[in-house]
Amino acid sequence: MTSRLVTPQLAEQFKQYPLYSQDGKKKDAICLCVFFIGKVRWYVLEGQPEGNDFTLFSIVVGLADTEYGYASIKEMESISVDVGHNLPKIPILQDKSFKPCPIGNIPDERLQSFLSNMYDREEV
């Protein structure tokens, strides 16, 4: 299943990273892609088709709290922001310049603060 957000290339990548495949990898988990709208980011770690939808597991940054969570591609594709002034609504988009890498290497202060709070305390 492909869609506006899940391209054939991304669907192929997800075959290597189905849900639960990166459990326990912490900061070494590979982030496959990034979706965004405004200052909100979905750092996607895993995904797989489920029926006529796609379920993603990601870290969401930029909402009230940063957290791990599951997201439906169909729901994400239905989200848009109306900025008014007769401008078109802004949908969630994929950061096409992003290259897969360990989540701990991504230069987003909010993300790294979340990861440090989750995992650095475990090592003490």
Language-model features: locations:
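Low-complexity intrinsically disordered segments
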Residues: 84-124
